[in-house]
A protein has these predicted regions:
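Basic amphipathic alpha-helical segments that dock to polyanions
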Residues: 198-199
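Key DNA-contact positions within bacterial/archaeal DNA-binding proteins
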Residues: 190
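Cyclic-nucleotide recognition modules
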Residues: 71-133
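Glycine-centered, phosphate/nucleic-acid-interacting loop/turn motifs that mediate DNA/RNA or nucleotide
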Residues: 203
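Cyclic nucleotide-binding regulatory module and flanking cytosolic helices
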Residues: 1-34, 83-84
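Polybasic "coupling" helices that flank or enter modular domains
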Residues: 97, 115-186
Length: 225
């Protein structure tokens, strides 16, 4: 496992090369093809996962089959940490958006790493705090922001993590369908498409298959506020 990717995870950002190499060698590796499910909401499990290649989506389903996307994650991001403290069922379904590879640590293996490594424990607390803050932001956005504002904010978040700056703007290969993007912002596909078309007509971005090119970050940022 690439040490640089491993250290992108807040939990392990403070590890030196020797410790990161030892940790990487103790992690099990899992590979999924696009569309494959790693685990379902309600499954039992006690592993923490770190994405090393590709992208995954974390989602929850309602009783009538509707899906809400909680997050899109890429290399260096981790999920499943709640199971280390609460052995209850998984709270979300994890599906590969692209071909993806993960490293995983079991509950017992991570506890051994936490023992005598206070910096790793602090990293875990930081990750949990960040996740809680993100949840609070999502709730606030659903209450106070309109759909175009939520779309703009989602695009900026994706650009921050997956964007590549070029002469014509920031290329964001998010690999999401229009329906998945709508699920991510908690709105209908039609409403999200209308917001995207409006942004494009204003010259803020250019739409491409499963990607966008953001040409005016400043105005898109203002719309996200």
């Amino acid at each position: 496992m690439d040490n640089d990717v491993l250290r992108q995870a807040p939990l392990f950002s403070s590890l030196d090369d020797e410790a990161a190499t030892a940790l990487g060698s103790s992690m099990a590796e899992t590979t999924l093809r696009r569309g494959d499910v790693l685990f379902h909401e309600g499954d039992s499990g006690d592993k923490l996962y770190i994405v090393t290649e590709g992208k995954v989506k974390l989602g929850r389903s309602s009783s009538d089959g509707r899906e809400n996307l909680l997050a899109i994650m890429g290399p260096g991001q981790m999920f499943g940490e709640l199971s280390l403290f609460d052995p209850g069922p998984r709270s979300a379904t994890v599906t590969a958006v692209t071909d993806a590879t993960f490293g995983s640590l079991s509950h017992d293996d991570l506890l051994r790493w936490l023992d005598g490594r206070p910096q790793v424990a602090r990293g875990l607390l930081s990750q949990l705090a960040s996740r809680l803050r993100k949840s609070n932001d999502v709730v606030a956005d659903l209450v106070f922001s309109d759909v175009p504002g939520r779309v703009a904010k989602a695009l900026l978040d994706l650009a921050d993590r997956f964007g590549r700056t070029a002469d014509d703007g920031v290329h964001v290969h998010h690999d999401l369908t229009q329906e998945q993007l709508a699920q991510l912002v908690g709105a209908s596909r039609e409403t999200v498409n209308k917001a995207l078309a409006d942004f494009a007509s204003r010259g803020w971005l250019r739409l491409e298959p499963r990607s966008v090119v953001i040409m005016d970050l400043e105005r898109l940022s203002r719309r996200a506020r």
